[in-house]
Amino acid sequence: FECKYEIDSLASFLTLTNEFLENLDHDLSVITTTWMKAYEKILAVLQRESRPLFDPQTGHAQPFFYLFQRDTNIGSETLPLGGVGNPVNYDTGLVRSAFRPLDDATILQFFVPGNAHMLSELKLIVANVFDRIEQTQETTRLLEVTQQFINDIELGLREHAIVKHPKWGDVYAYEVDGYGGALFMDDANIPSLLSLPETGLLSKDDPVYQNTRKMVLSKDGNPYYLKGPFFEGIGGPHIGIRNAWPMSLLMRIRTTDDDAEILDSLKHVMDTTAGLGLMHESVNVGSRGGNDYTRPWFAWCNSEFGKTILHLAVHKPHLIFKKEYAETAYDIDALFSELL
């Protein structure tokens, strides 16, 4: 446990809550006093990490609630400026994240996919929790704070995260700083720009998302899109510039309706398991059969593979089932609800 603060870690706790409630007929027994205390802590962290580096009135550096600094020979394993991280501007509505989903330090601290993830989960918490519980003075206060964050983050993403790219047009940047700085890239780990429809921020047909998707899945649009003779996909700085992550191809499948793109991506991930039949963390794009890989059994990616197959069972059954089963309409959520 490294104490690396990531906004998506907080959002994931809310994801777990929302999915529990939505799949168990909104059984509110989980919303205990302990849960409320945890939720209040999340709001406190969001408040603190929404502060700019400099006081807008005096221009002086403000006190910092979170610092991360350590001796390392890897630049992405610590934060600059004495552990503070690079400056962010005020009045953006966005929330800082010191690290990305796989522990690499952010360059510009407003991590866009993480803010999108948090925004969507806060909206669902209002619908799944606050709209259903008995209101008290305390829950009313928490609801008001939640709604303010929803408004602020939504506006912040609209005003700062969408940037006009000289080649790709209006796209979502991976990170921004509120000063006009924007980082054009994507990382395989979720949440990512590629996964924005799954965060609930937008639909996969959204024109800005479509521009963004083309950018991050292009060698000349995303510095971490890696392509070799045997494998291709989005990688990231965590492993290096030779390895793409199967996870990115699974997300590619879930964000398209194109049968050819889906089948090509499925073939890539199935042909690069090094004979183990399991998803790896990353695969060297120049490795035949995926024999040069990291982590032989990466639980996160195996879970994403299972999720992808369930997605195809509902939306594209003809691509994965024999003909006699391909015309069956599958309702996976209903099936799981029956099992639970």
Feature roles, as predicted:
Residues 33, 40-119, 131-132, 140-245:
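Extended ligand-binding clefts on enzyme/binding-domain cores
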Residues 6-21, 111-126, 184-200, 240-255, ...:
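Well-ordered alpha-helical segments within folded domains of soluble proteins
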Residues 1, 102-109, 289-292:
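Short coil/turn segments at secondary-structure junctions
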Residues 34-36, 136, 323:
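Compositionally biased, intrinsically disordered low-complexity segments
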